[in-house]
């Protein structure tokens, strides 16, 4: 494949089509060479629906993770025969025919552990191995051990894992980093993409695409050999995200790809199914029923696609932040996703060059440059002075500021003057006493105020540092770390999310109770500890006063959350 010559710029437009046609076969090949495991709602049909609607378990994920003790077809036949008999007990039937997931063991850390010691001690506790699984298990086998988030999350999750891996690398566990990269490469080769998590019911969607960044992280330890080794899988994942682009007309969308009227190619989140999520079955049905003016399948797809975004759920996806049934994830072009796609294209260019394919490297660079222009044109709100999502229905950029706006800075896709404006907007609207707010809207959803999440703290910190905005970056890290430390001092655990309106409180909202563990919080905490403390004086706990600053940080007053975006 030849790269275009500088003297013939009109050929540049052909490059994306050439790449997409060449790699379209990669995802198809992966799909054709594997038998896709069926999720429990399909395997068990009416039995699954009846069990979930009966609310036998406080958490709908419990039965989704239950393992049939025999062929599901035989269990279903027995159910149909017995269900109308006198004295039939559904709970007893489930207990006889299924092995329920074990409750997570409560980890009690040794007395007197520092924050760093606690995290280092958790890595083996959170490590799982499932080289083989039961035939009808919803859990998908993986060849190498992996680290799970913790709590109800008994499987590996895609985007969580990148931030967990940052911590593993910080702890010197490069073998575990390599194992997890190998697992994700295995999933790409087996299923054509990395699913939301290694469960059959997650196969219809992916999550924020961090695989290329995982390979780049591994390359810090193994050099270009890692980039060359995993180039085929990175190409396959890119083909998955761009699937359908070759036949797309201006103004159309296909699965995860969007082609705007001027030909700009961007991406959105998408789930291939439009049914209730097995792990949140009753909740999804209730959400769809609460808005009879919309087709239920449309709401289900948007709920699933929000889960694919990792932000399940947020006012970011909703017309009315107080009504989940107004979410329309698939008609929104996310700024964070397209920043990650830009980074994927840049890493593919680097890996192609490392493999000696300069022509392909040039083509990926061209794609990255085109996407960067698209981000600057469509995902910047000039009136507000921040990056934001693009609305496919109104054909304009949205007004809401969210922590996702820091992603262009994280991947070095932002213009310098805009990065400066983002620093101001972040400090003015999102920074709180306990860290960075996810949004400034209080909706009751977990990806809204007053919750702060570890991955978004790190993206903001790194992104602002990339553009010389070190004071704001340090403010975010310092306030979040203080929150983590205060919570740990009181409860001896790290949690999934934090209330950033104060310090020392776990977050709330969402579909399930607060989870501890917690993979990505552990990883980001280690990275931040090593960021704020000098290398010659590493710290095991958060210092009482902020290091690396001419003065200690002044306490932040809590900002009032806005009622609407």
UniProtKB/Swiss-Prot annotation:
Q: What's the protein called, per UniProt?
A: Periplasmic trehalase
Source taxon at top rank: Bacteria
Q: What is its EC number?
A: 3.2.1.28
Task: Specify which residues bind substrate according to the UniProt entry for this protein.
Answer: 152, 159-160, 196, 205-207, 277-279, 310, 511
Annotated GO biological processes are: cellular hyperosmotic response; trehalose catabolic process
InterPro entries referenced in this protein's UniProt entry, alphabetically: 6-hairpin_glycosidase_sf, 6hp_glycosidase-like_sf, Glyco_hydro_37, Glyco_hydro_37_CS, Trehalase_periplasmic
Family membership, please give it. Answer: Belongs to the glycosyl hydrolase 37 family.
Q: Name one GO cellular component term.
A: periplasmic space
Q: Which residues form a coiled coil?
A: none
Location, primary (coarse class): periplasm
Active site (catalytic residues) = 312 (proton donor/acceptor), 496 (proton donor/acceptor)
Its function? Provides the cells with the ability to utilize trehalose at high osmolarity by splitting it into glucose molecules that can subsequently be taken up by the phosphotransferase-mediated uptake system.
Disordered as annotated region, ranges: 539-565
- Keywords associated with the record: Glycosidase, Hydrolase, Periplasm, Signal
Looking up PANTHER family in the UniProt record yields: TREHALASE (PTHR23403:SF1)
Where would you find this protein in the cell?
Answer: Periplasm
| Binding partners and assembly | Monomer.
Question: By its UniProt entry, which Pfam families does this protein fall under?
Answer: Trehalase
Q: Name one GO molecular function term.
A: alpha,alpha-trehalase activity
What reaction is this protein's catalytic activity? alpha,alpha-trehalose + H2O = alpha-D-glucose + beta-D-glucose
Q: Which organism is it from?
A: Escherichia coli (strain SMS-3-5 / SECEC)
Signal peptide location: 1-30
């Amino acid at each position: 494949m030849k790269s275009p010559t500088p003297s013939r710029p009109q050929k540049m437009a052909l490059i994306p089509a050439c790449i997409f046609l060449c790699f379209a076969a990669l995802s198809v090949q992966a799909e054709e060479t594997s038998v896709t495991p069926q999720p429990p709602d399909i395997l068990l049909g009416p039995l699954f629906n009846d069990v979930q609607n009966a609310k036998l378990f406080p958490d709908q994920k419990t039965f989704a993770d239950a393992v049939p003790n025999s062929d599901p077809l035989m269990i279903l036949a027995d159910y149909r025969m017995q269900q109308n008999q006198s004295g039939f007990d559904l709970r007893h039937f489930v207990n006889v025919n299924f092995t329920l997931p074990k409750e997570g063991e409560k980890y009690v850390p040794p007395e007197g552990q520092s924050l760093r010691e606690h995290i280092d001690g958790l890595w083996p506790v959170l490590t799982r191995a499932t080289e083989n699984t039961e035939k009808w298990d919803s859990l998908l086998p993986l060849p190498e051990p992996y680290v799970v988030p913790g709590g109800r999350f008994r499987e590996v999750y895609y985007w969580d894992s990148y931030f967990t891996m940052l911590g593993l690398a910080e702890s010197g566990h490069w073998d575990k980093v390599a194992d997890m990269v190998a697992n994700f490469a295995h999933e790409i080769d087996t299923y054509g993409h990395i699913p939301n998590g290694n469960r059959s019911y997650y196969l219809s969607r992916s999550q924020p695409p961090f695989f290329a960044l995982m390979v780049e992280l591994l390359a810090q330890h193994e050099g270009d050999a890692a980039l060359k080794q995993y180039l085929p899988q990175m190409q396959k994942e890119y083909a998955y995200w761009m699937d359908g682009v070759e036949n797309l007309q201006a103004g159309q969308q296909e699965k995860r790809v969007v082609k705007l009227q001027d030909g700009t190619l961007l991406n959105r989140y998408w789930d291939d199914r439009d049914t209730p999520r097995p792990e949140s079955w009753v909740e999804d049905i209730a959400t769809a029923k609460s808005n009879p003016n919309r087709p239920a399948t449309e709401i289900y797809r948007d709920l699933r696609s929000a889960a694919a975004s990792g932000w399940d759920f947020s006012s970011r996806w909703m017309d009315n932040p107080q009504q989940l049934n107004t979410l329309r994830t698939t008609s929104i072009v996310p700024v964070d996703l397209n920043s990650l796609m830009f980074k994927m294209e840049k890493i593919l260019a680097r890996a192609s060059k490392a493999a000696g394919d300069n022509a392909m490297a040039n083509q990926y660079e061209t794609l990255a440059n085109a996407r960067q222009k698209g981000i600057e044109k469509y995902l910047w709100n000039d009136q507000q002075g921040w990056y934001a999502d693009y609305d496919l229905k109104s054909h304009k950029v949205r007004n809401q500021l969210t922590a996702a706006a820091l992603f262009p800075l994280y991947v070095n896709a932002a213009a310098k003057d805009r990065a400066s404006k983002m620093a101001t907007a972040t400090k003015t609207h999102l920074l709180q006493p306990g860290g960075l707010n996810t949004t400034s809207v209080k909706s009751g959803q977990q990806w809204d105020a007053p919750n702060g999440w570890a991955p978004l703290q790190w993206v903001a910190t790194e992104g602002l540092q990339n553009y010389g905005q070190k004071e704001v970056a340090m403010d975010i890290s310092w306030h979040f770390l203080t929150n983590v430390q205060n919570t740990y001092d009181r409860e001896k655990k790290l949690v999934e999310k934090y209330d950033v309106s104060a310090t020392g409180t776990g977050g709330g909202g969402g579909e399930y109770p607060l989870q501890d563990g917690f993979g990505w919080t552990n990883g980001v905490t280690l990275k931040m500890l090593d960021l704020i403390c000098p290398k010659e004086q590493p710290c095991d706990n958060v210092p009482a006063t902020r290091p690396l600053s001419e003065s200690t940080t002044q306490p932040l007053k809590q900002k009032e959350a806005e009622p609407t975006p």
